[in-house]
Amino acid sequence: MQVILLDKVANLGSLGDQVNVKAGYARNFLVPQGKAVPATKKNVEFFETRRAELEAKVADVLAAAHARAEKINALGTVTLASKSGDEGKLFGSIGTRDIADAVTAAGVEVAKSEVRLPNGVLRTTGEHEVDFQVHSEVFAKLTVNIVAEA
């Protein structure tokens, strides 16, 4: 099925590309998410007339993502308190939701889906590097300091 992409899609293309995808992928994911429209003659003409407007919208979203990434990087360190044992092992773990809530409380709005923990949840006290994927092209880093709760 031929579709026109309205946004950058990983491993597929960027705004304005006409790509051939499986019908189910287009029908169940790309079209409902607003990332693509079927490549009919009417849609191709409509897209070409609105191309500049859509490119400006994508540029605005990207600029907002860069601004949020700068705010996250500017925070430097966020401290979380959690119950732990004598050797610094936590009772439980610190996951994406806990980190997202702490960063949001520090003043930068972050969704838990934007937090990247490549090594899984955090289970020890100390400082940990955490990545944030604010946009498909924009990443930020933050240090999370986990301290033992008194």
From Swiss-Prot:
Keyword Disulfide bond: no
Protein family: Belongs to the bacterial ribosomal protein bL9 family.
Ribonucleoprotein is among the record's keywords: yes
GO BP annotations, alphabetical order: translation
Recorded superkingdom: Bacteria
Keywords per UniProt: Ribonucleoprotein, Ribosomal protein, RNA-binding, rRNA-binding
Protein name listed in UniProt: Large ribosomal subunit protein bL9
UniProt-listed PROSITE patterns: RIBOSOMAL_L9 (PS00651)
One Pfam family named in its UniProt record: Ribosomal_L9_N
Chain segments annotated as transmembrane: none
Gene Ontology, cellular component aspect: ribonucleoprotein complex; ribosome
InterPro entries found in the cross-reference section: Ribosomal_bL9, Ribosomal_bL9/RNase_H1_N, Ribosomal_bL9_bac/chp, Ribosomal_bL9_C, Ribosomal_bL9_C_sf, Ribosomal_bL9_N, Ribosomal_bL9_N_sf
SUPFAM superfamilies hit by this protein: L9 N-domain-like, Ribosomal protein L9 C-domain
A GO term for molecular function: structural constituent of ribosome
Signal sequence interval, chain numbering: none
Primary role: Binds to the 23S rRNA.
